């Protein structure tokens, strides 16, 4: 009989990472996030979550566990936002994770972040990622830390999304962890938008669509399937875009209003969800992807319901999430490793 491992989840968001863990051999026994907008969705789909600033939570209030996970805020490191990095107060929240790990001494630590964390520097010029590894290694008894930049589409997520995953085993367990090998080829047809957007009638959240801005409503109908802003006639472009079109070399040939075709794999679903920069236009309909469509691109199952009054906040929580399918593959590899060592 397979053992189930107890997980404490920090910075849980709407529950993408936690869903993947529960689909494997893990139970979430305690979770936390400060963002009010994610609470209802998390509780509806995963379970109870403590809505509180992690800096105000005493470690005595957190149960002992086998695993601690944390998707500490990625915006300060993200290339999709302004890269304030370690100077942004949110960039220091990983130290709160270290505080909890030090007190609870779980067998395994799982961190997740955007690839920008690989190049983010501390104020003294050293790399933040080296600091994180050093802090984990020098706890008592300390952790053997592995991290890798993973492509989500290598593991069955229908999206070209890169994420840095840390997996650290407590040193006294003497475990040499290896990340799972890819499960899907890059040309797997099941990953294309045509397959993902084939949604049965009456699936929850399919009718929830964030309306386009007046400017986008004017421009989007000109864009062909698989096209971009280059399909838009020069005469109807806003003045700002005309200046860019006039000097593409100077502006490094940006791609605005990308509309992927049904035969392509989606680009990265981001928290911003702006059609101009984020490639979230439906292949054939003049609108953003619906909430359900971006959820499917993120590999959330159809029965995972997103709740909230604000559509922009729902798009944001999905864009910030770890794809559950990627999380499950990582979880399975960790469970297998623990059980091979009779832990």
Predicted features, each with a name:
Residues 214-343:
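C-terminal target-recognition/interaction regions appended to catalytic cores
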Residues 31-32:
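The conserved SAM/SAH-binding core of class I Rossmann-like methyltransferase domains
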Residues 35:
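Conserved SAM/SAH-binding beta-strand->alpha-helix loop
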Residues 7-21, 54, 64-81, 108-114, ...:
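Conserved proline-anchored active-site loop of SAM-dependent methyltransferases
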